[in-house]
Amino acid sequence: MSPSNVFIDSSVMVGLFIGDEKAHKLLSKLINDGFMLCINPIVFSETMFKVTFHIALEDGIRGVYDLKKNLNRYSWVYEEVREKIDKMIKMNYLKILDTNWEVLKLAPEIGKKYNLLTNDAIIIATCKYYRINKLATFDSDFEKVDFIEIIKE
């Protein structure tokens, strides 16, 4: 992949969907600077769940179990997130990278070396596999990875 790719963590994607100005400014800057935004299925899944959970908490849902019992009230979030991601793809701002077996084989080693949880290790493994050295994130856990440049603003 070219150096113009930047991987976008779910912390930034969630911010975009819940109206966080910092996330919006960061993504706008990256697009204006000519970067192609990249995510994987892990980030898609985390974004979908965290946006749904955030909205449910604002409505008074008390936790994951309560959300699960009332999930039908939030099914609209699935479509809204999917539509916005689809629009970003069609505008050629975003691409979804495959999480293949080669990526998954890298993840345990990366998780152990950098003390990362599973999803974060898969994200970093995706970056390594696709030779992406920039990660837009608000998550400080990634700062310990020595081959990734963290972009926060």
UniProtKB/Swiss-Prot annotation:
Q: Does the keyword Hydrolase apply?
A: yes
- One family from Pfam that matches here is PIN
**Which residues does Mg(2+) bind?**
D9, D120
The PINc domain sits at 6-152
What domain of life does the native source organism fall in? Archaea
Entry cofactors = Mg(2+)
The catalytic activity of this protein is classed by the Enzyme Commission as 3.1.-.-
Write the record's keywords in alphabetical order, separated by commas.
Hydrolase, Magnesium, Metal-binding, Nuclease, Plasmid, Toxin-antitoxin system
A GO molecular function annotation here is: RNA nuclease activity
The reply on keyword Metal-binding is: yes
Q: Which residues form a coiled coil?
A: none
Q: Which HAMAP family match?
A: VapC_Nob1
Q: Check the record and name the PANTHER family matching this protein.
A: RIBONUCLEASE VAPC6
Family, similarity comment: Belongs to the PINc/VapC protein family.
Described purpose of this protein according to its UniProt entry:
Toxic component of a type II toxin-antitoxin (TA) system. An RNase.
| Protein name as catalogued | Ribonuclease VapC6
